[in-house]
């Protein structure tokens, strides 16, 4: 089996990948993550996940390279990572009582054969009605500044949800393991 490389510096994605009990290394790809004019959210995450995997293919020529990218979509608009408490508070105000769809792009590149599999896995979160004090307490407690949509589903963020829907809850954290297992099986990787 070729060695696995996770093209990400995300601790959340690393933690998810450890669940498969496969040895892997993690490396940070250096790519332009800008949104292109006219590009849909799905096209964006598919392109970026593939670009992340391809960016590491030269350094890892006999490996399976996993790339992933995620955006949140609210009322047709892409929500990025907030980076500041003020933007996180605003994103959660905007999401209050609404549904946000998270699109997670996933790519698995066999760098030896150059075969690439790419997918987009949607997952929808239906938010509770959130008052200002609850939003502020949450942002202060969890500091979700590096998370699209301004919450951490693996932590207190789940308290903000009324319900969720989708095929793979791990996609919400940023690495859809069910789809990844499908891709790894296609490459002949045995799990478990």
Curated annotation (Swiss-Prot):
Main EC class of this protein? Answer: hydrolase
Q: Sorted alphabetically, which keywords does the UniProt record give? A: Cytoplasm, Hydrolase, Nucleotide metabolism
Please provide, in alphabetical order, the Gene Ontology terms of the cellular component aspect for this entry: cytoplasm
**GO process annotations (BP):** nucleotide metabolic process
Q: Pfam families from the xrefs? A: Maf
Asked if Hydrolase is a keyword of the record, the answer is: yes
- Cofactor(s) needed by this chain: a divalent metal cation
One GO MF term attached to the UniProt entry: nucleoside triphosphate diphosphatase activity
Where does it live in the cell? Cytoplasm
Positions bearing the site annotation: Important for substrate specificity: 12, 70, 154
The reactions it catalyses are: N(7)-methyl-GTP + H2O = N(7)-methyl-GMP + diphosphate + H(+)
Active site positions, chain numbering: 69
Q: What does this protein do?
A: Nucleoside triphosphate pyrophosphatase that hydrolyzes 7-methyl-GTP (m(7)GTP). May have a dual role in cell division arrest and in preventing the incorporation of modified nucleotides into cellular nucleic acids.
Task: State the name under which the record lists this protein.
Answer: 7-methyl-GTP pyrophosphatase
- The protein's organism comes out as Pseudomonas aeruginosa (strain ATCC 15692 / DSM 22644 / CIP 104116 / JCM 14847 / LMG 12228 / 1C / PRS 101 / PAO1)
Give the source lineage, highest ranks first. Bacteria, Pseudomonadati, Pseudomonadota, Gammaproteobacteria, Pseudomonadales
């Amino acid at each position: 089996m070729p060695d696995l490389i996770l093209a990400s510096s995300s601790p959340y994605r690393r933690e998810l990948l450890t669940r498969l009990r496969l040895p892997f290394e993690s490396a940070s790809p250096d790519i332009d993550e800008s949104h292109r004019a006219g590009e849909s959210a799905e096209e964006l995450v598919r392109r970026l996940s593939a670009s992340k995997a391809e960016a590491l293919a030269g350094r890892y020529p006999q490996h399976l390279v996993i790339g992933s990218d995620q955006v949140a979509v609210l009322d047709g608009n892409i929500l990025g990572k907030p980076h500041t408490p003020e933007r996180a508070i605003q994103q959660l105000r905007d999401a209050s009582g609404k549904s946000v769809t998270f699109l997670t792009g996933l790519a698995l590149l066999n760098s030896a054969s150059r075969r690439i599999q790419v997918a987009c896995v949607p997952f929808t979160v239906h938010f509770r009605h959130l008052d200002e004090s609850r939003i502020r307490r949450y942002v202060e407690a969890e500091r979700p500044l590096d998370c699209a949509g301004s919450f951490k589903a693996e932590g207190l963020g789940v308290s903000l949800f009324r319900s969720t829907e989708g095929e793979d809850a791990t996609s919400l954290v940023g690495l859809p393991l069910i789809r990844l297992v499908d891709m790894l099986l296609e490459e002949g990787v045995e799990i478990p």
